[in-house]
Amino acid sequence: LDAIVSADGDGDRPLVSDEHGEPLRGDLLGLIAANFLGAGVLVTPVTSNSGIETAGRYSVTRTRVGSPYVIAGMNAALADGRPGVMGFEANGGTLTASAFTVNGTSIQPLPTRDSFLPILATLHAAAASKKTLSKVAAGYSLPFAAADRLENFALETSGALMAHLRASESNLAAFLAPVGSVALTSDIDGLQVMLEDGRMIHFRPSGNAPEMRCYVEAASESEAKSLLVQGLDLVRAFARTAQ
């Protein structure tokens, strides 16, 4: 077995598993496609892996979650005259705003989410390097990521939590004190926090359901899973006090 490939029903979200049956992250598939195309500008939501900025010689633009925001970011890059513009979402759905040439073949812009390009690019990466997909993935050295959500989480409580965390640095520091110290923050979509030890935690209310989502990154899978549990516990504790 070399790989398992599939897609969702309308073919815009790819799935690629390695020789062990382990799925590769969607944002990694998008990054592999960027290398395949020789892209210069990557547009991707804030929920895609934070290691993308250091994974190659790209200019990276972060957006809110959703393909319309990625498309808007690509269009802005084109308007600025920037070459080699493409985008992808954390699910691996890939879009291109520029024309690319690969092995003498022109690939015209496809500014709508697609799964076929990242699947082909990933299989090509394995074949060209004569490596297994697991080794191709390991070569990118992206932080380990995990995510989960709290369902039936009132929109009012989500709003109250976000307002509380954004109200002051001391509020945020006190909320996150059980897990670490704040280094940097981003509020592009929800609130993403880089901790001083290099880990990341991101709280984001769902845009279309009564859910609170939590995304984390760490140096190891076990650290990521532990941080995710802690993050969700912090949200639950806030919800209890807000009642």
Where in this protein do the model-derived segments appear?
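Phosphate-binding and adjacent anionic-ligand microenvironments
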Residues: 39-207, 211-215, 221-243
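N-terminal small/polar loop signature for handling phosphorylated ligands or for N-terminal nucleophile
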Residues: 1-19
